[in-house]
Amino acid sequence: MKFLAILSSMPFESGEIFDSLKNISTAKIAGKNVYIGALSGHDILMLNTGIGKVNAAHSATCLIENYPVKGLINMGVGGAYPESGLKIGDIAIASKEIYGDEGVITSKGWESLKKIGIPLVSHGKKKYFNEFLLDKKLLKKGKDRIPPNPPLKKGGWGDFQIKSGPFVTVSSTTGTQKRAAELRKRFHAVCENMEGAAIAQVCAIYKIPMLEIRGISNIAGERDKRKWNLDLASENCQELVLQMF
């Protein structure tokens, strides 16, 4: 038996998927609750990581070290960068994950780990610095399982768009338009979050295929929470994930 792991930072980001699991049992690893169940014939592990890179990396490592994990889906909400073409409620699928903070600040600006020659992960001649390409086969498999106009449990599919592109993982969410424009220009990214690159790094270490999907809850740089919609973002993201099974 091999498992597909589904991770989200907070319970509200994956509650609908949890409710869809059959034959649920619970285990505890390093103080974390791991939920084991079945979804459309697939053996599933679910875990809420908590916010941030360390929580995310620790959670992914706990699962991979204790269960035979064949693939991992990281999901939740995220902030879209201006000029990404995404709006609140849309879905972003990561083509790659990028650490947005790791590197060095010089008098000439930010430089990546590759620029200073320090890899995060090495597999022989293959070296990973700030960027981790996500699994193309799992990405294609996910896209291929989405019908052109699939019905959703809570409304019409045409209410949002799905777009793939680079994600940036940050330690501090972007709260100014200047910073949002800077990160968008530097990485050509569509979406930011606080966990994805850390999970992608762990998956690279263990050679586990990974897919990341996020619902857009806000526009990065916009701190007026009255304009955010966490519920819509998480609902749409979960509906898309469920369509893949």
Regions found by a protein language model. Give the residues of each.
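Structural motif
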Residues: 70-73
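A C-terminal functional module that forms or caps the active site or interfaces directly
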Residues: 170-212, 221
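N-terminal short beta-loop-beta anion/metal-coordinating cradle
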Residues: 1-61, 66-67
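Glycine-biased, low-complexity coil/linker segments
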Residues: 154-157
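His/Asp/Glu-rich mid-to-C-terminal helical/loop segments that flank catalytic regions of hydrolases
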Residues: 220-245
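Active-site-proximal beta-strand elements of phosphoester/diester hydrolases
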Residues: 45-49, 164-168, 213
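Mid-sequence, gly/pro-rich, charge-dense loop/helix-turn segments that line enzyme active sites
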Residues: 82-146, 159-186
